[in-house]
């Protein structure tokens, strides 16, 4: 069996799947990516190079689609030059355009991974009135779905990682898309009692309480500004607290720079209030093993997100048994039940977030069961092996489908 995975990045959402299939099932796995060609264990990497893309003169609303078409053609040309690759199945991430032309090259089924379908109302776009979007951004939002719609029509089947993300897809396409999470390696992300109280070279004394926050980028989409307000209140109420922040000073989503005039949302947030930065440790991007230690020594972990793609970090924190206080938003409610696997508060209420955290710090034994339940919940519903088994079952099912050759 030969599966061709397609994604601009590697390993992205497919690297661990390809590794599992090649090592445990003996399937041949190739991976088309912008990364250099070569091999990673048994996975062959095939490089594609985009030769163009959207420019400053490209209409703003069509730039995403323009880039996707360049991706589609680059992948097509790279694979046309490799006639020895004859996959039984193509699996690709929707939206980048990378699988759009492959029906003209291969007579095999295609599965797409659908991460997020954009909406202008009741979504990440309009959730924060304090960071309003422009009319042009709302128009662009609709245009960004063009390649997703093409993939929804073109694919034989698809999958989305969470019920929330699945619910954002157009109703007429949902039946052909399953909900299968990427999977959490609970052998790695697990409670480790007695772990050294050292993170990123910083030793945390036994007497200090630890409040943690982890993010890819410090931005409004992940409520960094509201987290900082809550953290300030926590440090003002307790002198024995250190705030550990893992993540990079960059904006991954949204238009924060347009609102703040600063390329650094973090620095803009710090300029809006008087923070005692001696109480904070900004650790930058830290490797997974350090994140495990961060979650292990955390007395309470804070997580905020607008209605958007759920961060893996919150499930990693849950798997490590962290007690979590998080935003009461749809993607979070799917994984955290208030009072059983964590605490949920209004996204826009930093006082409530601070009070929830202070309650945990004051009576840790009263809330310990939340972390224990969270770890068990991840093991039961999001553990890597069962998730991969479901993916493999989907792949095997689709390979045997009677297909519509005219799609």
Where are these predicted regions, by residue range?
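A short, well-ordered alpha-helix in the C-terminal region of glycosyltransferases
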Residues: 352, 359, 366-381, 387-393, ...
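Aromatic "clamp/platform" in nucleotide-sugar-dependent glycosyltransferases that forms part
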Residues: 306
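Conserved donor-binding/catalytic core segment of Leloir-type glycosyltransferases
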Residues: 200-222, 228-233, 243-244
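N-terminal subdomain of nucleotide-sugar transferases
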Residues: 1-46, 159, 407
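Short hydrophobic beta-strand element within catalytic cores of glycosyltransferases
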Residues: 323-326
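Conserved acidic donor-binding segment of nucleotide-sugar-dependent glycosyltransferases
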Residues: 338-339, 343-350, 359-364
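Nucleotide-activated donor-binding/catalytic signature segment of Leloir-type glycosyltransferases, i.e.
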Residues: 251, 257-285, 289
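Acceptor-binding helix/loop patch of EC 2.4 sugar-transfer enzymes
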Residues: 52-61, 108-146, 187, 191-192, ...
């Amino acid at each position: 069996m030969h599966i061709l995975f397609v994604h601009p990045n590697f390993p992205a959402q497919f690297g661990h799947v390809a590794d599992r299939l090649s090592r445990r099932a003996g399937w041949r796995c190739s991976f088309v990516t912008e990364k250099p060609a070569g091999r990673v264990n048994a996975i062959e990497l095939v490089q594609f190079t985009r030769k163009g893309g959207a420019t400053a003169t490209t209409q703003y609303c069509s730039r995403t689609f323009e880039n996707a078409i360049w991706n589609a053609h680059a992948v097509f040309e790279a694979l046309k030059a490799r006639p020895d690759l004859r996959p039984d199945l193509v699996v690709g991430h929707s939206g980048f355009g990378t699988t759009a032309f492959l029906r003209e090259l291969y007579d095999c089924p295609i599965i797409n991974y659908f991460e997020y379908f954009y909406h202008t109302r009741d979504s990440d776009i309009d959730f924060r009135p304090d960071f309003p979007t422009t009319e042009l951004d709302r128009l662009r939002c609709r245009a960004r779905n063009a390649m997703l719609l093409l993939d929804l029509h073109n694919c034989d089947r698809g999958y989305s990682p969470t019920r929330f993300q699945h619910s954002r897809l157009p109703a007429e396409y949902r039946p052909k898309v399953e909900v299968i999470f990427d999977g959490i390696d609970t052998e790695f992300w697990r409670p480790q009692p007695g772990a050294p109280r050292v993170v990123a070279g910083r030793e945390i004394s036994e007497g200090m309480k630890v409040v943690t926050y982890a993010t890819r980028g410090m931005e409004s989409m992940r409520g960094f500004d509201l987290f900082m307000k809550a953290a300030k209140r926590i440090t003002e109420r307790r002198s024995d607290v250190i705030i550990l922040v893992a993540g990079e000073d960059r904006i991954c989503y949204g238009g924060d720079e347009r609102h703040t005039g600063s390329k650094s949302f973090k620095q803009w947030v710090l300029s809006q209030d008087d923070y005692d930065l001696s109480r904070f440790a900004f650790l930058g991007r830290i490797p997974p093993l350090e994140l495990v230690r961060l979650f292990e020594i955390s007395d309470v972990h804070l997580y905020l997100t607008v209605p958007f793609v759920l961060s893996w970090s919150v499930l990693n924190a849950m798997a490590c048994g962290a007690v979590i206080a998080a935003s009461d938003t749809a993607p979070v409610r799917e994984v955290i039940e208030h009072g059983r696997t964590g605490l949920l508060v209004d996204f826009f209420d930093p006082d409530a977030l601070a009070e929830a955290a202070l309650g945990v710090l004051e009576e840790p034994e009263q809330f310990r069961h939340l972390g224990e339940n969270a770890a068990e919940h991840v093991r039961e519903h999001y553990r890597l092996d069962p998730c991969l088994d479901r993916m493999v079952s989907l792949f095997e099912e689709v390979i045997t489908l009677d297909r519509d050759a005219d799609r």
